[in-house]
Structures are given as structure tokens and as C-alpha cells.
Regions:
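PLP-dependent amino-acid enzyme catalytic core
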Residues: 1-106
């Protein structure tokens, strides 16, 4: 199976940090944190990793616009818009839900 082409948008690999104090506090474990906040993009690591493949496919097919859908608070939609802007593609978001402020909780 051939791996699909991807664009390089994120700064990878990101660091893996040993959380020494938490590991010590929990005892008998080593806790590590993958620092995908260090990708150098406006979006989180798992979103940009997926988009590197999707955007490469769009460009390879001659598309100039990305279209995606999600809820009004969708991190995926935000990530798609940011990545499209960075690459120079247009982006249309189809958002569902209310854009009005709904106050909940404490």
C-alpha cells in the first residue's frame, strides 16, 4: 500500500516531555506528554496532521477551495480555515448550531 502525499505545514516532530513531578507523585509510572502545541501552527497537532494529507490531495486535483462542516465551535473547521489561509486556498465553512451566546454551568 502506497502512502498518500502530504504537504508539510506543521513543524514536526514535536517534543515528548517527561513529566517528572507527576510521575513521581503517582509512583511507579513514567508519564510523558506529546507537545503538539509546538507544531508552529494555529491549530492542534492531530488536526493539522490530517489536513496535511487532505490539502495535498486537493492541490493535486487542482482544487482552489476547501469546504468542510462542523458545529459553530468546531476545532476542525477552525483548523481547516487556518490551514487554507496559510497555503493560499479559499475556504468555506458550513456550521451548524447557534452562534448566539448560551451561558451554561457555573
Amino acid at each position: 500500500m502506497k502512502m498518500p502525499r502530504k504537504l508539510t505545514i506543521a513543524n514536526l516532530p514535536t517534543n515528548i516531555e517527561h513529566l517528572k513531578r507527576l510521575s513521581s507523585e503517582l509512583g511507579n509510572v513514567d508519564i510523558y506528554l506529546k507537545r503538539d502545541d509546538q507544531t508552529g501552527t494555529e491549530v492542534s497537532g492531530n488536526k493539522i496532521r490530517k489536513l496535511e494529507f487532505a490539502i495535498a490531495e486537493a492541490i493535486d486535483n487542482g482544487y482552489d477551495t476547501l469546504i468542510t462542516c462542523g458545529a459553530v465551535q468546531s476545532n476542525h473547521a477552525r483548523a481547516t480555515a487556518a490551514a487554507a489561509a496559510k497555503i493560499g486556498l479559499k475556504c468555506h465553512l458550513i456550521l451548524r448550531g447557534s452562534s448566539e451566546d448560551v451561558f451554561e454551568g457555573n
